Regions:
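ABC ATP-binding cassette signature C-motif
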Residues: 42-210
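Coupling and communication elements adjacent to P-loop NTPase active sites across diverse families
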Residues: 1-59, 72
Length: 210
């Protein structure tokens, strides 16, 4: 019996050592420590969008007609529809209208990140407004808070994963203080850990989202 007890104790010690060596995966993306500031709020009575389109089409094929979308204040509007319904085409046109405005700070996050990003740039080059030391330090700190490694910060955007590219868009919108966001499936490339955190950031966003 003593020999058996000694063997059991030895096995317990081995399991304890193995548990210490195991990597524990977090339940949430704790490293994402960024968010939009209060200065991105949109007044409740402000008209953000008064958009009408007689006909929505792609390559000459009609998808819909007599569209009207009116958005006021800090509304969060979701455009739903099956694949091929023209959601992306519609969002591009809405973004085109909003990006021309001087009374709001609009941003557009497309499904295809290459539409609006020079993929030969590094994340630091994409985000930095100048080459001053304080600006570069700020950008690198934000990238670190979004779980970019020092190595990833020096890679070309094209070499990054879809999730890292998506985070780059969010950082750009945050650093630019955008208060109106046009987002085309913004969370589709995020991991199961990052996704809920990003959705929480969007839910708390005090500006307007389409």
């Amino acid at each position: 019996l003593k020999k058996k007890m000694k063997a059991v104790k030895s096995l317990e010690h081995r399991f304890d050592r193995e548990r210490e060596d195991m990597t524990e995966f977090p339940d949430s993306e704790e490293a994402i420590l960024v968010g939009f500031g209060e200065d991105t709020a949109v007044p409740a009575g402000k008209t953000v969008l008064d958009f009408s389109l007689p006909r929505l089409e792609v390559s000459g094929r009609g998808l819909s007609q007599n569209l009207r979308l009116y958005v006021r204040g800090p509304e969060h509007v979701c455009i739903l529809g099956p694949n091929g319904a023209g959601k992306t085409t519609l969002l591009r046109q809405i973004a085109g209208e909003l990006l021309k405005r001087g009374d709001i700070r609009a941003a557009y996050m497309p499904q295809d990140y290459g539409e609006t990003v020079d993929q030969d740039l590094t994340p630091v080059e994409f985000l930095a407004k100048s080459w001053e030391k304080a600006e570069l330090t700020k950008v690198k700190t934000y990238l670190g808070n979004m779980k970019y490694t020092a190595e990833e910060q020096g890679h070309a955007v094209r070499e990054l994963s879809g999730g890292q590219k998506a985070k780059l868009f969010f950082l750009k919108m945050i650093l630019d203080g955008c208060n109106v966001l046009v987002l085309d499936e913004p969370t589709r490339n995020f991991s199961p850990l990052s996704g809920p955190v990003i959705r929480g950031i969007l839910e708390d966003f005090p500006g307007c989202i389409i």
